[in-house]
Every structure is written in structure tokens, then in C-alpha cells.
Amino acid sequence: MAKYSVRELLEAGFHFGHQTKRWNPKMKRHIFGARNGVHIINLQKSVVMLRDACNFVRDTVQGGGTVLFVGTKRQAVELVSAEARRTGQFYVNHRWLGGTLTNWRTIQGSIRRLKEIDKMRVDGTFEALTKRETQQLDREGQKIERALGGIKDMERQPNLIIVVDTRKESIAVKEANKLGIPVVALVDSNCDPDPIDYPVPGNDDAIRALTLFISKMGDSVIEGMQLAGREIPNSGISAGEGSMEAQMLSQAGEGEMQSAEA
């Protein structure tokens, strides 16, 4: 049974928001106060909302759902791709292409083209082409891979998306809202929580805070797979093995301060 402690969030710097002048008034109910001109997020609320978000992710995956991690900001790029691979899910960590969800058929066409180029590399087709032709195909493939490599094995639209910066990923959020795809997201003091189905108030800039949030989401995916009796594809780990960061943070916060049990 997972635990989510205030201490764990505190040690990750989860409580630091943005400068008070940059806030979104809709976040008022999630703000504890201000210190030196910076909003402090109410971690008593964050820990409960994190638990609720994790439970939703777990239940969705247990029911056979798929998850799309979205994080294109510099601090999140590696975290998002690593967690998606660890859990056998999907990710977008470069620029979000408009229509990735709402124009799925067109995106599928680009993915098919990427797979065609990949196949040509291994079946000997490249050997029959000129150097210029192979270079053109390589460039084309690299461009598509950079944009869509994290979803090239996603056969259908995801059942939920997990977002680490709702301002930067506003197009992804809007597309998900339009299609009725639930959104789980980390929302900082300058964000609008209203379009988010499961908002988790917290710092969306600090590496430790991002690591904690993304790792908790990934652990919930794995828990859902465990409960469904499914193996975790392409992860290289056994079901139930949590991330190193999540394990260390959990140990640091265990038994201290208030905790919420799932």
C-alpha cells in the first residue's frame, strides 16, 4: 500500500511556487502563503491530491488503459522518456505536434512512414540506394523519430495523459479535453487547474519535484499492471519494482509527519 507523506514532498521542494506576481488566482485554494515574494503551496492538499491522482492512474491501467506521459521542458525530457520506458507506456518529450490526439489518423500515417524507413535500414533496401537517397531518408526518419518516437508503438489514443507543465503543454491539454481523455497533471502556482481532471499542486520546475511526481505516476502504472496480472513490456524490470528515486524518497518520508494511504 503506497504512502504519500508531506515530508517526502517537502524534501523534494514540492512546495515552492512562483513569484506572487506571476500567480494564477485560480490556484488560491491550493496556496498556503508566501515567503520572500514566492508562493508556498499547501502540501497538506498536495499529498491528498497526489494520492487521488495515483489511484486514478492505477485503476485506469488495471482496467487495461494506456498512458501517455507529456513533458517537453528541458528538466522533464529525460525523466519522461525514462519513466515511460520503465513502465512500457508512451511519451512525448519533444515539441507537441498539434493534432497528435485530435488528428490521430494523420499522426498514424507519419508513424507508418517511420516504421517503413526503419524496415528499409534492416532489410537491405538502403544498400541499393545512393548515398544521397539514404541521407535524405535518414534525415526524414530522424525528424519523425524525434517528434513521434515515443508513441510509434501506440496503436490507439491513450486512456489518460500525464502532464508535467500545463502552461507549456496547453495544446496537449486542450486536445485531451476535447476528446474527453482524462488529464493528470502537476500544477504550479501560475497554472490554471480547471482543465485538469486530477491536478496535483506542486513545483513544476525543480528536478527533485519533477522526479517525485513522475516516479509516483510510474509506480502507479506498475501497480495497476500488477493488479491486472500483466507483465510490464520493454521495461527490463519485474512488475512491482519501483524507481530508485521513489524508493529513496519513500524511505526518507516513512513514518514522519502526516501521510495519506492509498
From Swiss-Prot:
In alphabetical order, the GO MF annotations are: structural constituent of ribosome
GO CC annotation terms, alphabetical: cytosolic small ribosomal subunit
Q: Name one GO biological process term.
A: translation
Q: Which InterPro entries match?
A: Ribosomal_uS2, Ribosomal_uS2_bac/mit/plastid, Ribosomal_uS2_CS, Ribosomal_uS2_flav_dom_sf
Query: What family, per the record?
Result: Belongs to the universal ribosomal protein uS2 family.
* Entry keywords, A to Z: Ribonucleoprotein, Ribosomal protein
Query: What NCBIfam families does the annotation carry?
Result: rpsB_bact (TIGR01011)
Q: What is this protein called?
A: Small ribosomal subunit protein uS2
Q: Which organism is it from?
A: Magnetococcus marinus (strain ATCC BAA-1437 / JCM 17883 / MC-1)
Pfam families membership: Ribosomal_S2
Location of the region described as Disordered in the Swiss-Prot/TrEMBL record:
234-262
Classification from the root reads: Bacteria, Pseudomonadati, Pseudomonadota, Alphaproteobacteria, Magnetococcales
Superkingdom assignment: Bacteria
